[in-house]
Amino acid sequence: MLSLSEAIILGIVQGLAEWLPISSEGMTSLVMVTFFGRSLSEAIPISIWLHLGTLLAAIVYFREDVKVLLYGVPDYVRSFSRKQPHDPVISFLLISTALTGIVGLPLLLFVTDNVEISGGSATAVIGIMLIVTGILQRTVSRDESLSRVPGMSDSLVSGVAQGFAAIPGISRSGITMSALLLRKFDAADAIRLSFLMSIPAVLVAEIGVGLMGMVELDINSIVGLFFAFAFGLVTIDLFLKVAKKVDFSYFCIGLGVLSVLTMFL
């Protein structure tokens, strides 16, 4: 599936790009299409596989949040009348994950089954989606936001938004944080909820990819996973702080334009 050098490079790219609103799937797919000669339908399952590495890094980083939520699940299931402080977040994750699957699975199947483009055309498709991501980020204001617990409408909007991240070039963190900011969450809560909702969504995606036999597991794919985890764990704290302060919309738009232009070179 991957050579050793490809696995290492892709793992590093995934580990670095996951925490920034620039589409790690788009970045790894762009590398595979541009430099490794893969088609877009070949690149996407590999990109999803590498997300498992950064998922593990996110679980380690958000371990206290994850622990509280897991401990709260039994009480959440047993009683809906005796509400606990973490219940709104559990409901948010359950509903948003379900919506992500409903929206994202058909998109993933369509792209992997019907989009056999490669080379400049595939690069241009990813570039267009990066431009869309950048424009979306430009339209979102971080002013007049507040810290609050998520509700039903927040779950619906965020879950649908996350589903569209199945399209390479659409940043999962970028589109979900944008959705949460539009719902008037402050930046810190938007980032925290965005990455918490990525944990069940990525787990479900990994199970789906595995059941459909879309990824061939070998030693090199494990190496790629390890590098994604290691670089993700080392960079997550710094990059999340950077993501709160830096506007990455121009990066997405600029890289997207360059990617589209490669089709004509």
Curated annotation (Swiss-Prot):
It is a multi-pass membrane protein. Its main location: membrane. The chain crosses the membrane at residues 42-62, 90-110, 115-135, 160-182, 195-215, 222-242, 245-265. Its EC number is 3.6.1.27. GO terms for molecular function: undecaprenyl-diphosphatase activity. It is found in: Cell membrane. It is an enzyme of class 3 (hydrolase). It catalyses: di-trans,octa-cis-undecaprenyl diphosphate + H2O = di-trans,octa-cis-undecaprenyl phosphate + phosphate + H(+). Signal peptide: none annotated. Keywords: Cell membrane, Hydrolase, Membrane, Transmembrane, Transmembrane helix. GO terms for cellular component: plasma membrane. It comes from the Archaea. Belongs to the UppP family. Catalyzes the dephosphorylation of undecaprenyl diphosphate (UPP). This is Undecaprenyl-diphosphatase. It comes from Methanococcoides burtonii (strain DSM 6242 / NBRC 107633 / OCM 468 / ACE-M). The lineage of its organism: Archaea, Methanobacteriati, Methanobacteriota, Stenosarchaea group, Methanomicrobia.
